[in-house]
């Protein structure tokens, strides 16, 4: 977000992003993470058997992934950057996919609330209202 904001403000013609953009990642807004944790504390009381069998692990997530290309396009749109995106394929993509199985949380009755684009917009608004000179950090 910062990189695209600075490119917009400085009228840069392009933003360079590492990798091919093909890797896929899952993103969860922090408010949803907090809500999911509280939900588990209130609604999940494992039995001794569940504890012994290791059935106490729950993934908090959306269960949906996006490519880094899709993410970058969303950020570009949210920020209002009009330049081009250049992919530096000499840099690594990392793991091809990171996606959680959230079916156990869904069975308990919990689901995330904030869609990725809305979360990015909220994060960008926060950044605009609270930014500091991050170039020197």
Describe every region a protein language model picked out.
Residues 3:
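Conserved AAA+ ATPase "sensor/coupling" helix adjacent to the nucleotide-binding pocket
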Residues 6-137:
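C-terminal substrate-binding subdomain of Rossmann-fold SDR/epimerase-dehydratase oxidoreductases
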């Amino acid at each position: 977000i910062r990189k695209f904001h600075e490119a917009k403000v400085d009228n840069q013609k392009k933003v360079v992003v590492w990798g091919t953009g093909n890797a896929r990642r899952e993103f969860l807004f922090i408010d949803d993470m907090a809500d999911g944790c509280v939900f588990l504390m209130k609604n999940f009381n494992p039995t001794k058997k569940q504890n012994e069998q290791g059935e106490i692990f729950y993934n908090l997530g959306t269960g949906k992934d996006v490519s880094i290309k899709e993410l970058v396009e969303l950020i570009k749109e949210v920020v209002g950057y009009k330049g081009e995106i250049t992919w530096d394929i000499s840099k690594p993509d990392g793991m091809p996919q990171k996606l959680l199985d959230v079916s156990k949380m869904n069975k308990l009755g919990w689901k995330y609330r904030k869609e990725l684009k809305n979360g990015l917009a909220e994060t960008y608004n926060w950044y605009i209202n609270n930014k500091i000179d991050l170039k020197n950090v």
